[in-house]
């Protein structure tokens, strides 16, 4: 029995070695098997920290995830990602390098690529068509050196699936489209920590999530979000210059469910009509602002509000109070009461 167990574990060891026999000696490879009797396998390859002199690196033919981060790579050529094994990539991590230039066809062979991480590099621009034909669903361009960005770069990618784009913590003063008539399916756009002074015009983009935290926006005009009628979550936190939100700024956001206006210390007052049109809003964060107490008429603009945060220790919630039944007048009209956990305050 003992000999059989030894043979069994020996065979397992040989199988594991065989599964990663094409793994580069400086990389770490992990095989994942799927299907009946593990008939299908994919390999995750970690080639981070191997140094710039070792790229491009040969990888197993069934590689699905490749990590090339932290290699001090300065550029991506047309041939660097075109060797055997690269065409099956689903996920590619090029973060935390020194990449300042990417050739126009650098990703052209990666026809299955869904996730691309280019964060923490030195990129200032990207060539038109660099994402042509890619089925990307997630792209991280955060912590680079972009000063302006043309979203039309994404019109040439495969449009079947929505994409999440992270451009946070760059140097952006402008984000725009030159051809708003072309379809552009971006689901989530992260623009936090940039230098935008106004709400960007994002016409023709069916965004559901938008983050503008930590920009230099000083005022938000009436109708600033009129083109973003499908927004579900909007974050406008930490706008150190924000002093004014005009009435009707959110008037077209009938699908918005969560609005974050926290940490805007210069925002002193809010006209009740600022919240007009927010008929689906359920969560509102006003913590660390100076706009409390709020007028009762504010809540009339938000019939579906469920939760309001007014400070670190002040959280409000709406309770539906069923009216009592009276023999003479029948069922009394129910009331919605907003209760705050600050000394039992009721607004």
Curated annotation (Swiss-Prot):
One of its GO terms (biological process) is bone growth. GO terms for cellular component: extracellular matrix; extracellular space. Residues 20-61 form the LRRNT domain. LRR repeats lie at residues 62-83, 88-109, 112-133, 135-156, 160-175, 185-205, 206-227, 230-252, 255-277, 280-301. Keywords: Developmental protein, Glycoprotein, Leucine-rich repeat, Repeat, Secreted, Signal. Residues 1-19 form the signal peptide. It is found in: Secreted. Pfam families: LRR_8 (PF13855). The keyword Transferase does not apply. Glycans are attached at residue 285. It comes from the Eukaryota. PROSITE patterns: LRR. Contributes to various developmental events through its interactions with multiple signaling pathways. Dorsalizing factor which functions as an inhibitor of bone morphogenetic proteins during gastrulation. This factor is named 'Tsukushi' because its expression pattern in chick embryos is similar to the shape of the Japanese horsetail plant, tsukushi. Forms a ternary complex with chordin/CHRD and BMP4. This is Tsukushi. It comes from Danio rerio (Zebrafish). The gene is tsku.
């Amino acid at each position: 029995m003992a000999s059989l167990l030894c043979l069994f574990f020996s065979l397992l060891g040989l199988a594991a070695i065989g599964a990663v026999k094409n793994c580069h000696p400086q990389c770490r490879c992990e095989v994942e098997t799927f299907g009946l009797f593990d008939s299908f396998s994919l390999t995750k390859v970690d080639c981070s920290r191997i140094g710039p002199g070792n790229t491009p690196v040969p990888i197993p033919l069934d590689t699905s995830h490749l990590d090339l981060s932290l290699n001090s790579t300065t550029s991506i050529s047309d041939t660097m990602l075109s060797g055997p094994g690269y065409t099956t990539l689903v996920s590619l991590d090029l973060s935390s390098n020194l990449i300042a230039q990417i050739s126009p066809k650098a990703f052209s062979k990666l026809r299955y690529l869904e996730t691309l991480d280019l964060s923490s590099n030195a990129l200032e621009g990207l060539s038109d068509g660099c994402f042509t034909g890619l089925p990307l669903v997630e792209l991280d361009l955060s912590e680079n050196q972009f000063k302006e960005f043309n979203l039309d770069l994404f019109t040439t990618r495969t449009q079947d699936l929505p994409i999440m784009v992270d451009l946070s913590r760059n140097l952006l003063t402008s984000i725009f489209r030159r051809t708003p008539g072309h379809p552009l399916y971006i689901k989530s756009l992260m623009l936090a920590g940039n230098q935008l002074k106004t709400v960007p015009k994002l016409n023709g983009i069916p965004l559901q999530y938008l983050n503008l935290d930590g920009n230099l926006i000083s005022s938000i005009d009436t109708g600033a979000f009129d083109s973003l009628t499908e927004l579900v979550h909007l974050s406008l936190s930490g706008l150190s210059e924000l002093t004014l939100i005009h009435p009707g700024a959110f008037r077209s956001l009938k699908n918005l469910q969560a609005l974050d206006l926290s940490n805007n210390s210069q925002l002193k007052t809010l006209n009740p009509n600022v919240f007009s049109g927010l008929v689906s809003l359920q969560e509102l964060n006003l913590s660390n602002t100076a706009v409390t107490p709020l007028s009762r008429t504010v809540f009339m603009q938000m019939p579906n509000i469920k939760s309001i945060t007014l400070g670190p220790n002040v959280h409000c919630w709406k309770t539906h109070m069923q009216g009592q039944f009276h023999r003479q007048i029948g069922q009394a009209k129910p009331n919605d009461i907003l209760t705050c956990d600050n000394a039992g305050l009721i607004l």
